[in-house]
Regions:
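Residue-level detector of Asp-centered blade-edge/turn motifs that repeat once per structural unit
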Residues: 154-156, 204-205, 253-254, 297-298, ...
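Amphipathic beta-strand/beta-sheet edge segments enriched in Tyr/Trp
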Residues: 83-144
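Short beta-strand->alpha-helix linker/helix-N-cap micro-motif
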Residues: 21-90
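C-terminal/domain-edge helix-coil "capping" segments
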Residues: 20-36, 122-125, 129-189
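Short loop/turn segments that connect beta-strands within beta-propeller blades
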Residues: 119, 181-185, 230-234, 274-278, ...
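Hydrophobic beta-strand positions that form the internal "hydrophobic ladder"
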Residues: 160, 209-210, 255-259, 302-303, ...
Length: 436
């Protein structure tokens, strides 16, 4: 009975309110670095008319905001609607790179971005983006320019999955699933179950979502069932309703299997399940409950939570065989929650209960080099890495008054510098999952 209590506790961890003081954020260890200077110009000739100029300014503002997430690399010198669209026009102004926007169609909106090296006076890339959604056009163009300048992928086209209780009414406990751009724009409600959605994950190709559902009602026999959603059609289907817990599911890199926690045989254990056939393969087999798996992209390492030491701590194993090479890797706090691999598999971010609150830590996948990322900033949970390894989204609860506290989704860089909330005034927002 005691084991089942803390299993349920872990599964519902992100739904519990922990009141904390409203504290000031201080960036730790921020160094002064030489930054790349970027200018963004919308061609006045192509963006003729007041409405088009309004769109041009909005696109430039989004591109500038996108680049600001990499503020240790970039400084945006200017954004303006201008006829000065030649790279040579900006050399004397100190710009290293110039992004020139030209509108080719208003309906649907089509914009071309040309990225120039000002010093070399040459074009690095051209990108045409067409979409009725202006924000998607802007993010797409920003991503192309970022890649042209750095040679690396960006986060600008990525999405974040999350859960919010904004539909909750008095007496209800409603939590539904939502999807948004990485910066908090284009929020879209995905589910309308009128129940409690928990433990979501998004597939590697960004086309499917898996989540668990506790249906509304007061029955003590309520099951925790597992659903799979197609993001193209927004249709969900039940894929596991075994007795007890069907939760904590994550997509495997092979696109065929998911890993999840099941308790249908009595104890909570981690399994692989084929999404098409629902065939199971058991990975853990221990008298202590094992929950919340996370895999590296190669599929040869699995981090998970286990109470083998008495309280939930992070363990690592080779998931290719049952109970292979199991070893404990975390020793911080009273207990841990939600371990998540970085995309490159080198690090694990997790939350730990320490000093009467949750804070977020990261450590190398071998258990070395522990780094505390949050401190004196509410109660911080559910870390999830960006697709480029550079950022971590997480949920944090702040006290607004004596009677009100709210969870929001925040973004910080991997060193712990926090950028701010991306879900203000959207209910309690928890369990973020960044697209791969």
């Amino acid at each position: 009975m005691k084991k089942n209590i803390w299993v349920i506790f872990l599964l519902l961890l992100s739904n519990i309110v922990f009141a904390q003081d409203n504290l000031t954020v201080v960036a730790i260890g921020q160094a002064t670095l030489e930054k790349t200077e970027v200018a963004i110009v919308a061609s006045k000739r192509s963006f003729g008319g007041s409405e088009n100029i309004k769109n041009a300014n909005e696109i430039m503002a989004i591109i500038k905001n996108d680049l600001s997430f990499y503020k240790k690399k970039f400084s945006v010198k200017a954004t303006e609607v201008s006829q000065a669209t030649d790279a040579s026009d900006w050399k004397s102004k100190g710009a290293d790179f110039l992004i020139v926007l030209e509108m080719t169609s208003a309906q649907p909106l089509s914009v071309k971005a040309t990225t120039y090296s000002v010093k070399e006076n040459r074009s690095l890339s051209e990108k045409m983006s067409s979409n009725s959604n202006l924000r998607r056009v802007a993010h797409d163009l920003a991503d192309n320019s970022f890649r042209a300048i750095t040679g690396d992928p960006s986060i600008f086209n990525s999405k974040i999955l999350f859960v919010s209780d904004r539909d909750t009414r008095r007496g209800d406990n409603i939590k539904e699933l939502y999807l948004m751009d990485f910066d908090g724009g284009n929020k879209t409600q995905l589910t309308r179950h009128r129940g409690m959605v928990i433990s979501p994950d998004i597939s590697f190709d960004g086309r499917k979502v898996v989540y668990s559902l506790i249906k509304e009602g007061r029955s003590s026999k309520r099951n925790i069932d597992l659903y799979l959603m197609d993001l193209d059609t927004k249709e969900s289907k039940l894929i596991s309703s075994r007795p007890g817990i069907n939760s904590g599911a994550i997509f495997m890199p092979d696109g065929v299997n998911i890993a999840l926690t099941l308790s249908h045989e009595g104890n909570a254990e981690i399994y692989l399940m084929d999404m098409n056939t629902q065939k199971l393969k058991r990975i853990t087999n221990h008298y202590s409950p094992d929950v919340d798996p996370s895999f590296n992209k190669a599929g040869d390492k699995m981090a998970f939570l286990s109470g083998r030491s008495g309280m939930p701590m992070i363990y690592m194993m080779d998931p290719r065989s049952q109970e292979k090479d199991v070893r404990r890797i975390s020793y911080v706090g009273e207990f841990n929650a939600t371990p998540r691999f970085s995309p490159d598999g080198k690090e694990i971010a997790f939350s730990s209960w320490l000093d009467n609150r949750f804070d977020i830590f990261r450590l190398d996948s071998d258990g070395n080099n522990l780094v505390r990322l949050t401190k004196d900033f509410g109660s911080n949970e559910d870390p999830t890495y960006s697709n480029d390894n550079e950022f971590i989204a997480f949920s944090s609860q702040r006290v607004l008054s004596r009677t009100k506290a709210v969870h929001n989704i925040y973004i910080m860089d991997r060193e712990g510098e926090i950028f701010g909330s991306i879900t203000d005034n959207y209910g309690n927002c928890i369990t973020p999952r960044w697209s791969k």
